Amino acid sequence: MEKYIILILSYVIGSIPFSLIIAKINGINLREVGSGNIGATNVARTGNKRLAVLALFLDSLKGFVAVYTAQQFCDNNDLYIYVSAILAVLGHMFPIWLRFNGGKGVATTLGVLIALNISIALAFVFVWLIVFFIFRYSSLASLAATAAAVIASFFFQKELFLILLTVAILIFLKHYKNIANLLQGRERKFL
């Protein structure tokens, strides 16, 4: 029974819209700024770097907390840990509090990766930074980092492959407009 509670908790934790809350406290409506997304990247588009870093930290932290909590109650490699990881990301993407209209799940995925395998998390961050600084597209960096995490799972922890592939599919689906804009040369660079 407690494992089912952990799964529900993972979704609920993932559903906390920290970026939206932080922005609102500071008089910013993220739905009306930049891309309209409620994630940390859109907080960065407001020009407030301090808020952006805080949003990134808190959105990542909720992914970490959800998985870490599951790890405390489950055996290593227990399916419940992996399902809690997916549910935390789904919570961010489809939060119950916002009529299931949330962010894209990238920062929350980083937190999940830190809890599951730090080597994969580092590969994720490394690829994100490299792609971002070369191309200046947050969306492209996020997609590349997500793909890199799936590939890295082959080298560092094969049992994470299907979980990370599932998360990657979700992230790619949430980025479908960005992908179309990238292909058409209309995606906005992050300056």
UniProtKB/Swiss-Prot annotation:
GO molecular function terms listed in the Swiss-Prot or TrEMBL record: acyl-phosphate glycerol-3-phosphate acyltransferase activity
EC category name: transferase
Chain segments annotated as transmembrane: 5-25, 51-71, 78-98, 114-134, 153-173
Membrane topology according to the record: Multi-pass membrane protein
Catalysed reaction equations from the record: an acyl phosphate + sn-glycerol 3-phosphate = a 1-acyl-sn-glycero-3-phosphate + phosphate
Principal subcellular localization: membrane
Keyword DNA-binding set for record: no
Lineage: superkingdom: Bacteria
One annotated GO biological process: phospholipid biosynthetic process
Pfam family membership, one: G3P_acyltransf
Signal peptide as annotated in the record: none
EC number(s) from the headed UniProt entry: 2.3.1.275
GO CC annotation: plasma membrane
Disulfides per UniProt: none
Pathway(s) per entry: Lipid metabolism; phospholipid metabolism
Subcellular location, record wording: Cell membrane
Summary of the function given for this chain in its UniProt record: Catalyzes the transfer of an acyl group from acyl-phosphate (acyl-PO(4)) to glycerol-3-phosphate (G3P) to form lysophosphatidic acid (LPA). This enzyme utilizes acyl-phosphate as fatty acyl donor, but not acyl-CoA or acyl-ACP.
Protein family (similarity comment): Belongs to the PlsY family.
Subunit structure as annotated in this protein's UniProt entry: Probably interacts with PlsX.
This protein's name: Glycerol-3-phosphate acyltransferase
UniProt organism field: Wolbachia pipientis subsp. Culex pipiens (strain wPip)
